[in-house]
Amino acid sequence: MSEVLSVKEKIGYGMGDAASHIIFDNVMLYMMFFYTDIFGIPAGFVGTMFLLARALDAISDPCMGLIADRTRSRWGKFRPWILFGAIPFGIVCVLAYTTPDLSLNGKMVYAAVTYTLLTLLYTVVNIPYCALGGVITNDPTQRISLQSWRFVLATAGGMLSTVLMMPLVNLIGGDDKAFGFQGGIAVLSVVAFLMLAFCFFTTKERIQVPPSTTSMREDLRDIWQNDQWRIVGVLTILNILAVCVRGGTMMYYCTWIMGSPEVFVAFLTTYCVGNLIGSALAKPLTDWKCKVSIFWWTNAALAVVSVAMFFVPMHATVLMFGFIFVIGVLHQLVTPIQWVMMSDTVDYGEWTNGKRLTGISFAGTLFVLKLGLALGGAMIGWMLAGGGYDAAAKTQNSATISIIIGLFTLAPAVCYVLSAIIAKRYYTLKTPFLTKILGELAQGARRNQQEFENLPVSKELKN
């Protein structure tokens, strides 16, 4: 398909991810802090809970991809899930930020149940959404444009959520922070629902895939045999691990290192503005140079900047604002490229084995993304607990301070170095090879269409 997508459809598609990021970024930045400092749950338990919830995702994510690939409706395969999953998703978001008056054990059980439900419903909405991008168009240029719009709006959605959350908490709850968090997420959940509805009504599934007749086991085997899908899966874990560890530590960093929790909103806003610029730069830069080269060079630059941040003196506020802006630009520059690379692996899989597994491929990607999110949350929780973090203390011990600085700077740097090395050495779907693959797939589709049109028709049918 070479149809040029309208700006309205690109915005509509981007609104779907803006809605997801309203919740996803909020959970990534605030949920650890909410559980430890508002709900009063031990940091070590929260870290373990985040990680164990991923065990369920190992089953739910591929199942959702399998179901989406086999869905047949007048709205397509993927769009119905976006609309009909939106309301329960919003309700569970509010429940996850609710603080019932329970014993410590009761609180831990409540948090585990609501957090697990939240991740399940995120799966129901987001796996079909991610797969939708693979069936709107198969034109490489249009895909980059679509994903650039997606991540500009996704960044705006995440910025809307994370920057407005604390003002909403203070406005709605005042001194009652627990009620403020509940009210704040309720407002944002309504906004997310409206965005998902807009996505549903403005997008169209153009690439028609024949009904799947294979089992989930066979589909899982096929995507695992796709070596380029495995490479992008590893890159996805590293990417989200870097942003999750830094994002989840940001509140602690502003409070205990920069010495002013009030600076958090401005600090986060600076990062998000950088994100917006990075998303907008993805399309022109990939028009100029191969997206794979842009990807690994940018990850290398992120590693260098992250290490440099480690040496910034405590309370050097202005310098840190400059660094976090650069990090925001560079990180969000590679994110849309990474999602296009995942779409390319679906084309590569179809080219190698004749099966287009869009839904389950993106289900696997979302699983590794959430695995990275869980590993990041677990790492923060375990390391803070190991360092003796005390939410009620006026000052933290030196071990905790060192851990917070390391999590905010060096841990992401390691992820970015590994991403650069892996992308440069092992990812092979560069522009010339991908053009060849798409050309051969298009020839095969035309040949199949011609064979269908030239099938002999019996006399009975003619009469």
Predicted regions and their residues:
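Membrane-embedded alpha-helical bundles of multi-pass transporters/translocases
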Residues: 2-463
